[in-house]
Amino acid sequence: MKRILVTGASGFVGSRFVERWKGEYTILAPGHGEMDITDVVSVERYCMEKVPDVVVHLAAISNTWYCEQHPEESYRVNVEGACNVALASARCGAKLVFFSSDQVYNGNRESGLLTEDIAVHPENVYGRHKLEAEQRVLGICPEAVALRATWMYDMEREGMPTHANFVLNIAHAIKEGAQLRFPVREYRGITWVKEVVELLPHAFDLPGGVYNFGAENPLNTYETACRYCEMLTGEQDSAIILPDHERYPEHVRNISISMDKAHRASGGTIRFHDTLEGLREADR
């Protein structure tokens, strides 16, 4: 049985990955006391002792606002931590699958679905750190796979960590009769975490490099919210969702991803629903 080391196994994605795949892989899920990703000696010691076949690196500080306020901590975890995991993976011969982010695209001016081969110019701390982590990790482990994940969501599930997200925010607003504003000048993929977890093992066999990994979405965030609210209420013009024309005044914020590269490289096995299709599936 293949041995999979998961960093961040108690987090949003990691906990769901462990639950889904624990019967089909030997899952290694060390806590911080067993393996501290900011300590290269700790990471190498654990990896050399356990000798995983694959390392899925999910541990990160992913709150973009927090990273802006604490850039040194973000760098230590999101860049240096990733490099430590890469060094240990290379030393023990494990395939590394590392989660990056669509935030690397947040300074781009292109329209449409963005591909991995375009130059990127991230404008926030988190995006810059994830981009540097990609570059340094692939320098250490050329066969590593860096997955640029999107904003993710799940329904509330007992025993699973859940944070405020797109679907829960809208569902709660409908229940409470509140209103929410969503930006008109933003385009981004929004992905059901269940699909990420289901498709992640297919990424183990990808050639080394950077891949977008999530739902495509041609709609702006306001349009997406309107369509999801309509799914829940049956009302086409709900007063719950309001347009926000003020956010991103400098330029349209487009971080929508194209999945063509991963789809081709996986022989078609990595195939996400688009954002609206995923929302319909999740709501069944």
PLM regions: where:
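Catalytic helix-loop patch of NAD(P)-dependent Rossmann-fold dehydrogenases
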Residues: 76, 81-84, 104-147, 152-153, ...
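Rossmann-fold cofactor-recognition segment
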Residues: 29-39
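SDR active-site strand-loop-helix element
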Residues: 7, 30, 55-59, 96-102, ...
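Mid/C-terminal beta-alpha module of Rossmann-like enzyme folds, strongest
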Residues: 199-247, 283
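NAD(P)-dependent short-chain dehydrogenase/reductase
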Residues: 138-188, 194-195
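Conserved C-terminal active-site "lid" loop/helix of NAD(P)H-dependent oxidoreductases
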Residues: 220-226, 241-282
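N-terminal Rossmann NAD(P)H-binding glycine-rich loop of SDR-like oxidoreductase domains
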Residues: 2-21
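NAD(P)H-binding glycine-rich loop region in Rossmannoid oxidoreductase-like domains
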Residues: 37-77, 88
